[in-house]
Amino acid sequence: MSSSHTIQETKEVHTKTNKRIQWDDLDPKRYYFYNFLLGGSIDLLMFPLDVIRTRLQVQGSQNVIQSFPQYNGTFDGFKKLIRLEGKRALYKGFLTSECGYLCSRAIYFGSYEFVKQGFLKGRSDSDSDLLFVTTISGAISEALASVIWVPFDVATQSVQIQGSLSKPKYKGGSDVFKKIYGERGIKGLYKGFGATIIRNVPYSGIWWGTYEISKSKLTQFNIRQKLGLKERSSHSLAVSAEIDKNNPSHEVENEDPIIHFISGFFAAVFATSITNPLDVAKTRLQTGVFPENEKPNFYTIIKSTIRKEGIRALWKGLVPSLLTSTPYSMISIFLYEEVKKLSLK
């Protein structure tokens, strides 16, 4: 990090005299470069769990052509997939997913920081204001990113559910785009868009609200001291005015990475558990094959699932979802907060 970002060494007790890092404090070029690098690296590690999650969520649905054997849980799914389809199958749809994810990620995080900064202006530092602003900002950023993400999500999941028990319909992600567009037009690529919004927007709002409140509470609780960890020597970071003359030099809070890590865990567990039924319905709606005279929607999918499989079916895939979202959330938010520090002007 350059000298303009030098951490101000101090042994003083942390206070709220330094503001949090905001959008105006960041250099966009560095911010987006580090975000792309970060997102791709984490996805490479976590994608296999996403394949298993998708298959678990669609198995048992009468509207999805199942070409893989019945999985009796996450680990059984891994065992059968590798044995029958090989290790490469763990990354089915990865390139398609990554193209959409990296583009939507840029919109998602950038819009979150920008919208949050706008909403926080003129508001107090109270937890209630923080919860409201971050929840709304998270929801808005997800809605914007979903416009880019949904077609790639449809293509990715269509490839992920193709097993070894029948001839695959699609050769890959690009083939999915070509065939779906040819058969159903742009509407086919946005199949389940409403369901995605209904699932992802609440998830994002709940996640960010939980995360930011957890950060605030853990800071007040002095979690580092409670865990018996060494006191940090630096509590502020310098922002230079060299890049943006309209944003004078000032200091921002150097937040504790331990707090980011723990808050990411709380946010993932809470948001994933609450919205899993919405995720099951979204996946089935996007990957299902329905009669021409049948026009399924979010409500009918959930109603049909409960009637035919019981209410517990709405939590299918929760374990792999938690195994994916929790470490992903903890690691990605920890690194994302560090990216913000590296991207200071």
Curated annotation (Swiss-Prot):
Similarity-based family: Belongs to the mitochondrial carrier (TC 2.A.29) family.
GO biological process, one term: transmembrane transport
Record-annotated membrane-spanning stretches: 32-52, 89-110, 130-150, 192-208, 258-278, 317-337
Pfam families referenced in this protein's UniProt entry, alphabetically: Mito_carr
Annotated function: Mitochondrial solute carriers shuttle metabolites, nucleotides, and cofactors through the mitochondrial inner membrane.
Main location: mitochondrion
Entry membrane topology: Multi-pass membrane protein
Topological domain ranges for the Mitochondrial intermembrane compartment: 1-31, 111-129, 209-257, 338-345
Induction line: Up-regulated by phagocytic stimuli.
Taxonomic classification: Eukaryota, Amoebozoa, Evosea, Eumycetozoa, Dictyostelia
Cystine residue pairs: none
UniProt-recorded name of the protein: Mitochondrial substrate carrier family protein J
Topological domain spans for side Mitochondrial matrix: 53-88, 151-191, 279-316
Keywords: Membrane, Mitochondrion, Mitochondrion inner membrane, Repeat, Transmembrane, Transmembrane helix, Transport
Cellular compartments annotated: Mitochondrion inner membrane
Gene Ontology CC entries for this record: mitochondrial inner membrane
Solcar repeat start-end pairs: 30-118, 129-217, 255-342
Coiled coil: none
Database matches in PROSITE patterns: SOLCAR (PS50920)
